[in-house]
Curated annotation (Swiss-Prot):
PROSITE patterns: RIBOSOMAL_S28E
Entries under InterPro entries matching the protein: NA-bd_OB-fold (IPR012340), Ribosomal_eS28 (IPR000289), Ribosomal_eS28_CS (IPR028626)
Superkingdom of the source species: Archaea
Gene Ontology BP annotations: maturation of SSU-rRNA; ribosomal small subunit assembly; translation
Coiled coil spans: none
The UniProt record lists the keyword Ribosomal protein: yes
Pfam families the record matches: Ribosomal_S28e
Family: Belongs to the eukaryotic ribosomal protein eS28 family.
Example GO molecular function: structural constituent of ribosome
Stored HAMAP family: Ribosomal_eS28
Record protein name field: Small ribosomal subunit protein eS28
Amino acid sequence: MSDDMIYKEAIAAEVLQVTGRTGVTGEIFQVRCKILGGKDTGRILTRNIKGPIKVGDIIMLRETEREAKALGRRR
């Protein structure tokens, strides 16, 4: 599969809020993002993102069907 094929099907989303960190060492960020294109335009999703991220960043999502579960409270 070529790289061109992967990016043609991706949908842009803007990061609205960084809600928390997860993962064993906190390397995964949970963010709320707004879909900017496709059939779900305007929908707000919660997603898990690996790597540096901040509010206002544009991320490319391969699919917009799945949503991340809310982070549990620490005891």
